[in-house]
C-alpha cells in the first residue's frame, strides 16, 4: 500500500518475490504477480505447501486508517510467480480479532497459526487446524498448549526440515524482545515440546522472528537488531551453522582381556539428530 501504517510510520506492506541466480546472488525483488494479492492493507508472513502450489498469507485490513486485526488468505498458483485471486481462510468458530502467521505442512492439510482466540494463555498463542477434504473445511482450532504457548506473545511459526517447530516468543526467558525457539517434534503426532532458545548470534537484544530453514544448516530470519546504518528496522539475515569439527581418539579392547587392543576395529559415532561418523 501507499499509505502510512500509524503503528510503524512506514508504508503498508506488500508481498514481493526475489529470485536467486546461478551464482547464488539475489536478483532485485518484484511485486508478486496476482490479482487481489497486494492491496492497500498490510500483506505479509507467507507460507507455501510442499509443492509451492498453494500460498497462505496474512492480511491486516484497515478502514479509515484504523487497523482491524489480521486474517489469513489463500491463493492457488497459476504458473511461475503468478497467483490466482485469494480467498479468506474461514475458521470455525472464529471469535478473534487477529489470525495470522500461517505455517503449513508439506501436504497443505495441517496449519499452525498465531491468534488471540479465546481459551489461550495470553497475548498471541499458536493454534492448529486440519483441513477435512470431505467437508471442504478446516477443523476447530486447537491450542498447542502451555509447553509452547506463554502469557506473552507466541507467533511466527515455521517447520524445520525434520518436523521440529521454530517460533518466536517474548514469554520465555531470552536475550531480548521476541526470541526464536526450536521445539522438538514428538513422534508421528502433531505435537511439540521442550522448546529451546536458539541463542546468540541468531537472537539479539531486539526482536528476532520468522526463521525459515533453507537446508538443515542454513536459513534466513528477520531481526530488528541495529543495522550498519544504525537503525533498528526489520531486516532479513542469513545464518549458517558451521560443520562439527572435533578430534576423537578411541582405543578398542577385548571385553574379556582389557589390555588386549583390537586393531582395525570399526567405530560408529551417532549424534542426537541421527547423523553418523565412521572410522
Where are these regions (language model features)?
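Short, conserved micro-motifs composed of acidic
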Residues: 1-251, 255-261, 266-268, 275-278
